[in-house]
Curated annotation (Swiss-Prot):
Residues 52-71 are annotated as: Disordered. One of its GO terms (cellular component) is cytosol. Pfam families: PEPcase (PF00311). The lineage of its organism: Bacteria, Pseudomonadati, Pseudomonadota, Gammaproteobacteria, Lysobacterales. Its cofactor is Mg(2+). Coiled coil: none annotated. This is Phosphoenolpyruvate carboxylase. Belongs to the PEPCase type 1 family. Its EC number is 4.1.1.31.
Length: 904
């Protein structure tokens, strides 16, 4: 597996990557020969050679089908896993190469910092006239919050992710130029050990993960990766500011984290009041345990003796106070440590943390008290020649406490608007509640939302579940503090009545503070094209409502709105979704400003382009002026979490990129573009006609039958990827009821990737026919929004394969002749206009590194896809009863996901 097509050319900086891929590819070959047989390796090589030849000659997939069809399920599974293992090592090599390139930039000492990093952002800001004073005034307004979700798009189980980390560590160690030959041999042995253990581990769990499993999975990234790199992020920022401006102001907290795991009830009956309480408790235990361990290490480090160095009087006073507060813990102090006040104070701080965990006397009442203790130690060290005797390590812990508090990550709660509406209708005994217009419902809800009247309690299941949720939130606020709770998100929000409903239910559930207000940030989520269009009217109605405005005043006159990238794309296609999101932000900002409210956005992005994925820096550059304003809250879903935060060095890079992008977009937003006034109608036309084409396709008679036959959606629904069902419970198989994640996942597996491009060509053609070709070319050149949109579509197109998609389509029988020509024609139209407007002869011509990465993978994905089609046809012939075929199909899904590096 170490030969390459001659046409694959690596740029000079990427030659080490080429060498790694060759070396690791050879290692995969050795693994296959050892674990299966030499004959099996020979067979893999024959298939691989055929796949490469087929790509080079643009031959049909039938050349592969002859070698692959009709295999026994176990043989097919082994073959798929062989190619998947190749993807695994290539993905690892590419991640390690990113670390290598980062180190090369840092070592170079040149005036050109790594693009999109903090040094790059600050140099660009200074070049644009930003002074240190202006930067210092802005820093307290910066608030970057990645929010981790448990959507079922992570197709790799944790046991394999952990082994992947071992492989990464061995390769990173090998980057050290001082390694001896024996050490390099040891590095290779460690890599092979982890790779072999991975081969002997099943790709997926036989049971669906619980909410607790998902919580543990996300907690791994928070406690094992981000906990480690957060202080380094601030140190990097300090270094960048000092290098750019000569001095460093005191840095506020810029980063925090959120999570939906345990709080996302939308469509998931496994999430309720118990998981909310359990998640908050588990996160509290996890982060306090980390603090205790770190304080233990600090106690050993801070062994300064009063016979040799002084400590501050304030620290000695605190030590005596803690001895009185925690007499049992003080009595356990070792006499030989009596002259080590830092060590003694650290021991008592650990005892306070244990009391906090146990809800016992002497507990910290808030993270700020622990911060004060750490600051006391820092001040004493600084005043007594201790800057190089532990100050650095103590400050790292202080940054962690500021970032993670006692809660680790803020927990959001989400539920669909219809669930709230049904509960209120039952409580009020109004069977026609849904039939009443929003204005009438808002008027009825007003007295309950403001507390003038009590919403009646009823004992049905829906009301009982919601009452328990709000009671759990009230208890959590008391026990864990307000910082532990994020937002309450209303999915499928349509009007102000949906928001007032939550306010009324929260009051009934007891979520009321001492001032009589509901201490909850309620966030409407606009996620269909129509709701995005109507979002401005909804927010205007909401902010004009006296009851809600009173609530908002108690929340600092700041309103958050969540924008749904996934469902809007499924609803109207990617062009309408992107443009609807762009317009909605502009209009919502204007409406909120007119009413004296600060509006912030929560971006519900997924991993794939169809669901809003892509580089954060480019997304913020393309965002409307003023839409960032120091704040970035964005979901991190599924495989994105692993890709961005699975390795510490890359997690640090991701945090730097987000923070740098927010600084640039906030302090020096893009200059106003007068031409946008005439570009917008052109984009309106593109979006409108794109939607017409997209909906004509997905709303055609028998389309859902075609979708279910021409994609492996039935396999995906049988996989144990997450705790949430793929379809809203109790609803039929209509497209509107299918979750956006499996929708995108299925089309990606079938290599048609419909959600990422369908309709775009028709929209662009309509604009050209209307005489706007020059405007489109101008937009592609000078409008970051449109350029980013086209680049994203180009990337999706480059990952698709029409020939493979046709194999899947033929599984639909007679429906193939009706639907596949539409796909083929729209694809040709889209690809033609995207290349023309980007002025490229081939897709991704401007991004040769990404193009090379995709070309490296495609010949290895093709055999898996061809096998997948054959296995799918045979499995369906058994009515989905053959478990051996299903296991092989699951291996195919995992293999294609590894190759494409995205799922849903």
């Amino acid at each position: 597996m170490n030969e390459y097509r001659s046409s694959l050319v690596f740029a000079t900086p990427d030659l080490p990557l080429r060498d790694d891929v060759r070396r690791l590819g050879a290692l995969v070959g050795d693994l296959l020969a050892e674990q299966v047989s030499a004959e099996f390796l020979d067979e893999i090589e024959r298939v691989r050679t055929t796949a490469i030849s087929r790509r080079e000659s643009d031959a049909p997939p039938s050349t592969l089908s002859e070698q692959l069809t009709g295999r026994e399920p176990r043989d097919a599974e082994a073959l798929v896993r062989a190619f998947s293992t190749y993807f695994q090592v290539v993905n690892i090599a590419e991640r390690v190469h990113r670390i290598r390139r980062r180190r090369e930039y840092q070592r170079s000492g040149t005036d050109t910092p790594q693009p999109d990093g903090l040094h790059d952002a600050l140099r660009r800001l200074k070049a644009q006239g930003v002074t240190l004073d202006e930067l210092s005034q802005w820093l307290p307004r910066i608030d970057v919050e990645p929010v981790f979700t448990a959507h079922p798009t992570e197709a790799v189980r944790r046991a394999l992710l952990e082994k992947e980390q071992l492989m990464v560590a061995s390769l990173v160690d090998n980057l050290d130029g001082m390694r001896t030959p024996n050490e390099r041999t040891s590095d290779a042995a460690r890599f092979r050990m982890a790779l072999t253990a991975s081969w002997q581990t099943a790709d997926s769990s036989p049971v669906r993960p619980t909410v607790g499993d998902e919580r543990e999975h996300v907690g791994f990234y928070l406690t094992q990766v981000l906990y480690r790199v957060i202080p380094v992020m601030y140190e990097t920022l300090e270094h960048a500011i000092e290098e750019t401006y000569g001095s460093v102001p005191a840095l506020p907290r810029l980063l925090r984290f959120g999570t939906w795991v345990g709080g996302d009830m939308d469509g998931n009956p496994n999430v309720d009041a118990n998981t909310i309480a359990g998640t908050l408790d588990a996160q509290r235990r996890a982060v306090l345990d980390r603090y205790q361990k770190e304080l233990w290490q600090l106690a050993s480090l801070l062994s300064q003796s009063t016979t040799l160095v002084q400590v501050s009087p304030e620290l000695m006073t605190q030590l005596e106070r803690y001895r009185a507060l925690l007499p049992d813990a003080a009595a356990r102090s070792r006499p030989r440590h009596g002259d080590m006040p830092y060590r003694l104070l650290n021991d008592l701080m650990r005892a306070r943390l244990q009391a906090t965990l146990d809800d016992a006397d002497g507990a910290y009442t808030a993270p700020s008290e622990l911060e004060d203790d750490l600051q006391l130690i820092l001040d004493s060290l600084q005043a007594n020649k201790g800057l190089h005797a532990g100050w650095f390590a103590v400050r790292r812990l202080l940054w962690r406490v500021r970032s993670f508090g006692f809660h680790l990550a803020r927990l959001d709660v989400r539920q669909e608007s219809s669930v709230h509406a049904r509960a209120v209708a039952d409580a009020l005994g109004q069977t026609d509640w849904d039939a009443q217009d929003a204005t009438r419902r808002a008027a009825v809800l007003g007295p309950y939302a403001c507390g003038q009247e009590a919403l009646p309690r009823v004992q049905d299941e829906g009301n009982a579940r919601l009452d328990a949720v709000f009671a759990a939130l009230a208890d959590a606020r008391t026990r864990h503090g307000a910082d532990a709770l994020g937002s309450y998100i209303i999915s499928m929000a349509h009007n102000r009545a949906d928001v007032l409903t939550v306010l009324a239910l929260a009051r009934r559930g007891g979520l009321v503070d001492a001032a009589g207000a509901v201490p909850l940030d309620i966030v409407p989520l606009f996620e269909t094209v129509d709701d995005l269009r109507g979002g401005t009217g909804t927010v205007q109605d909401l902010l004009a409502d006296p009851v809600y405005r009173q609530h908002l005043a108690a929340r600092g006159d700041t309103q958050m709105v969540m924008l749904g990238y996934s469902d809007s794309g499924k609803d109207g296609g990617i062009a309408a979704s992107r443009w609807g999101l762009q317009r909605a932000q502009v209009e919502l900002l204007e409406a909120a400003a007119d009413l004296g409210v600060r509006l912030t956005f929560f971006h519900g992005r997924g991993g794939s382009i169809a669901r809003g994925g892509g580089k954060t820096s480019r997304a913020l550059d393309a965002a409307p002026r003023g839409s960032v304003d120091g704040r970035l809250r964005v979901t991190e879903q599924g495989e994105v979490i692993h890709r961005k935060y699975g390795i510490r060095a890359l997690a640090l890079r991701s945090l730097e990129q987000m923070t740098g992008a927010v600084l640039l977009s906030s302090l020096r937003p893009r200059a106003p573009e007068p031409r946008e006034a005439r570009w917008r109608p052109v984009m309106d036309l593109v979006a409108e006609r794109s939607t017409v084409a997209y909906r004509a396709f997905v709303a055609a008679p028998e389309f859902m039958q075609y979708f279910r036959l021409a994609t492996p959606i039935d396999v995906i629904e049988r996989m144990t990827l997450g705790s949430r069902p793929s379809r809203r419970l109790g609803q039929d198989a209509a497209l509107s009821n299918l979750r956006a994640i499996p929708w995108v996942f299925a089309w990606s597996q079938a290599r048609a990737v419909i959600p990422g491009w369908y309709g775009v060509g028709s929209g662009l053609q309509a604009a050209v026919d209307a005489g706007h070709e020059d405007s489109l070319r101008e937009m592609a050149q000078d409008w970051p929004f449109f350029r980013t949109f086209l680049d994203d579509v180009a990337m999706v197109l480059s990952k698709g394969d029409l020939n493979i998609a046709e194999l899947f389509s033929r599984l639909s029988g007679d429906l193939h002749t009706r639907f596949f020509p539409l796909i083929r024609d729209e694809l040709a139209l889209t690809k033609g206009w995207v290349k023309a407007l980007l002025q490229q002869q081939s897709l991704l011509q401007h991004d040769p590194r990404l193009a090379l990465s995709i070309r490296l993978r495609n010949p290895y994905i093709d055999p898996i896809s061809v096998l997948q089609v054959d296995l799918l046809q045979r499995w369906r012939a058994t009515d989905g009863e053959d478990e051996a075929l299903l296991r092989a199909l699951v291996a195919c899904v995992n293999g294609v996901s590894q190759g494409l590096q995205n799922t849903g």
